[in-house]
């Protein structure tokens, strides 16, 4: 049996207040109130306690009581309430209270009973009644659950029966579909076989047509060759006559088109003149009848002008056509013409054959002369080659001699320059100076000038001197500068952008090629490292002991000037 707390059960002495007992005296204590009533009782109890607390805070000390006195007063109030309930009703009507239910027990001998025992018995009765109600509710729930289970089982059985019926229907439908699919597959197979036979028949027909087409193409090619042959032997005057005939036809088409355009133009001008005349008559009309006639004439002329304006101008003739092959006439109308041409060609061919034989004999004689001349020229070339070798040796010796003389001249000019005390002498244009004490070779300077001369667009000529090349380069530069001054800024900007674009493209290509080469080099090094054997150190590693002594180099400052350094260099060269 479950045990409940008296304070948590509404309707008991410990869980009710004095005012609640008086208000619910006629209610059945064995009925469990609803949940909202329990919560309402709790809220009322909480509000009552808050109110009592506020009242206690405002009361005087003399009016306040202890907790024991409050409990005694509550117990006395509850006992009085129970006594009022146990008294019999005074009126003739019976009530549904607990006192009315215990009327039969009032005639028995009353024994004195303690209030606590009475409340305990009431509590036990209430708890028993609550336990019975709980069990009845559980039994009712179990019965309801069993009923729901039975209904669910019935529904499941019904669903299983329906599923079985549907499955049977599905099997039947599936069998029908299988039969239909088999019939359809047989029909498709038959149709496929028919299509295959049709394809074979069409392939056979296509092959026959293709062979016939090839035969016609061969015939057409033969006809084209015959036509080309006939055109080749046809006199040119015939083609000129055909071209003149075609031109006359084109001229006739152009003349017809021009006449149509002229007729349309005349009709428009006539309609416009009629409209102008009608307007003039309407403006000069003096009577109503004349005005009406002029107005009708204006309407008619306007309508006629609209009709004429709606007419489209004739399209110009298409002159881009050739003679129709069906209308084109052939020069050869009789076989005798071809026989005459063949005879003439045969005679000319015999003449050409005779000329070819004579030409071949002359060619053989020329070949023999060529062989003899070649043998003689080879012998002469060998002799000239020996002379060339001798001349080259002489040229080399002369160049060496000229070089020695040039070096001696440079030494003399250097001595003269030092005696004058000037580092930038006028002879520097001849000797050149790439820096302090560094003479430039005249040959290198001439080669540089010649390279610039060739890059400027001139032809390389060994007979031109360096000064002439420089003069030509200067003239070329002046010409280009004059051309650049005459150019528009837009053209110059466009050319600069194009050159800059080309330069960037070349730089980009070079960069990509460099990156590609570096990538290939890295890949090669990686492959070498991967293929190289693993180096394993053996033994004890070397330890750093002490660094070897280092000697400090003292740099002596050179206080000499450029002239002294050049003099020493010249003297050293002279001594050498």
Swiss-Prot record:
Pfam families: DUF4200 (PF13863)
Free-text disruption phenotype from the record: The mia1-1, mia1-2, mia1-3 and mia1-4 mutants do not express the protein in the axoneme and display slightly jerky, slow swimming phenotypes, reduced flagellar beat frequencies and defective phototaxis.
Source domain of life: Eukaryota
UniProt region (Disordered), positions on chain: 1-29, 417-439, 495-519, 538-563
GO biological process: cell motility; cilium movement; inner dynein arm assembly
Coiled-coil blocks: 125-226, 254-311, 342-408
Membrane spanning stretches: none
GO cellular component, one term: axonemal doublet microtubule
Family: Belongs to the CFAP100 family.
Name under which the protein is recorded: Cilia- and flagella-associated protein 100
